[in-house]
UniProtKB/Swiss-Prot annotation:
Lineage: Bacteria, Pseudomonadati, Pseudomonadota, Gammaproteobacteria, Pseudomonadales
Organism: Pseudomonas putida (strain GB-1)
Annotated localization: Cytoplasm
Gene Ontology CC: cytosol; membrane
Entry's family note: Belongs to the acyl carrier protein (ACP) family.
Main subcellular localisation: cytoplasm
SUPFAM superfamilies: ACP-like (SSF47336)
Descriptive protein name: Acyl carrier protein
UniProt-listed InterPro entries: ACP, ACP-like_sf, PP-bd_ACP, Ppantetheine_attach_site
Record-listed O-(pantetheine 4'-phosphoryl)serine modification sites: 37
Limits of the Carrier domain: 2-77
Amino acid sequence: MSTIEERVKKIVAEQLGVKEDEVTNEKSFVDDLGADSLDTVELVMALEEEFETEIPDEEAEKITTVQAAIDYVNSHKA
């Protein structure tokens, strides 16, 4: 089974239409990977589905980088 980091990066690449090797931990979804506000909402929804968790809006707003997404999932996984 893939690690959480690998799974998050795969989702980010799929949702934002970028190559997986472009998705590194320090990358910002908006500034580095070209996401817009709709992309970030869809990305959060994909993360919720993949990891079977609910991410409240106030928490979702803080998830702006690949590492932030990884950290959130790690700290909230069942």
